[in-house]
């Protein structure tokens, strides 16, 4: 069974706190992605990784960093959370292949920064 697991469904943090959002996939996928989903803006890519220790900035990397120490785990880090980072965060993974491999999404983490 295809599975992408995010650490929490709901998180509430204070402004200035450090936040870790964890994502694990059990399908041996090379590619992993972190998105945020906001009303009227759709899915926006924050960072992605195509292998261990590899990371690439997406469209909105400002205020975020990532870690990919193991193939199955991709962590999104907010060094100092701000209220404009209140959002739904979605992790996804896919195989690398000669065709467009489908993205498998986690259930999402709703982060509220107060």
For the regions a protein language model found, what residue spans apply to each?
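Extracellular domains of the immunoglobulin superfamily
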Residues: 1-114
């Amino acid at each position: 069974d295809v599975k992408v697991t995010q650490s929490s469904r709901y998180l509430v943090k204070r402004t200035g706190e450090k936040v870790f959002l964890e994502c694990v996939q059990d399908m041996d996928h090379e590619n992993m992605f972190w998105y945020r989903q906001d009303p009227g803006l759709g899915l926006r890519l924050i960072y992605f990784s195509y292998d261990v220790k590899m990371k690439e900035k997406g469209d909105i990397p400002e205020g975020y960093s990532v870690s990919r120490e193991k193939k199955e785990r991709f962590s999104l880090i907010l060094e100092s959370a701000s209220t404009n980072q209140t959002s739904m965060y979605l992790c996804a993974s896919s195989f690398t292949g000669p065709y467009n491999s489908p993205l498998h999404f986690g259930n999402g983490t709703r982060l509220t920064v107060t």
